[in-house]
Amino acid sequence: MEFHAYPKTPRLKRDIVITEKLDGTNAQVVIVDTSKGGAYDGNFCIAKQGTLAMFAGSRSRWITPGKLTDNYGFAGWVQYNAPELFELGEGQHFGEWYGQGIQRGYGLDHKRFALFNTARWGAHNPNTPKCCEVVPVLGTGSMDNEVNLCLDALRLGGSLAVPGFMNPEGIIVYHTASKQNFKVLLENDDTPKGLATS
């Protein structure tokens, strides 16, 4: 039997990164180097560049372009933008696919893909694909007051991702010590998802 040590407990009062919680659908772009071995299902491969293979996924499954196999057109978008998305490099790149026809819609006439990893992607990294955006950072610092300050700013000023949209969903708090995301909603935050009403 393999021994599993109890994990270290991260300190709560460490730096956090607070981003706007976009109301769309979870999505991912996965890029693998096929020359390194390992198994992958070619049926789900959307694009190839040299030894790199690209895949698209929702929160729970692989998706491919097509009416019955896609998730709000994300796989089709990935296929179309593959040459630029290969700039993400090898790895699993999570984000939110949002806009026209998805959840709140944000009053947009198109869809957007916003990457979650704000430390890696954004204006500070010239390799950030131009077809992607990054979830807006609302605040950074210690956990004491930052969460309430960011919630108040979002409530009063509306969405930073889509200026003028006054019904944003909430925030995501990334706790740097635990490497974990936590969400705080502007409405029904204390109510389980299945019981919340709009």
Predicted features along the sequence, with ranges:
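Core nucleotide-handling region used for phosphoryl-transfer chemistry
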Residues: 1-198
